[in-house]
């Protein structure tokens, strides 16, 4: 049996939130699944040690310029999925587009959120109700990312992670402006932590100009000597930290 999961939200955090639901489907049918995900999710790096996921297929959409954008892009995606010969698909959205793509790809059994009901969908509760209704399973939202012990040990040595300090990883970026925390709030958080703890802060962010502005302001603050920026690293290098 070959199963496809479609999750088209753009962010890394969104992808991680859906991870327990993806794994629950794999466990239910006893086979690892394939996932159609946005490239921005960095899923190929984050999920490389996940035994429940067989392969990552990237959905390449970028403001009408991506491989899978528009009518031609949909046709390309249909042919790609048809060649995979999936038996079932679970679509974690209410998109008619993905419903039609799945049907035209020859997938016989399609499970999907109710069509045309995107508004006011709670990201976790909607997914929980979806799998409970379709498969009769209850899924807790407790995502776990598997990281091998050797990578963790190497990161401790490389970044001098001392357990006498509070070592705090701060995700100061975000997949959009509404998901980014202003730098003054992050700096205030650092003040509160450092009032009572010896702390070191690892700053995880991307190269987006708005994220770099946040990083620069933090690195120009009085906490700069306590901060280690991680913006030049891949996700696979950051995770063991």
Question: Where are these predicted regions, by residue range?
Answer:
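Catalytic machinery of carbohydrate-active enzymes
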Residues: 1-241
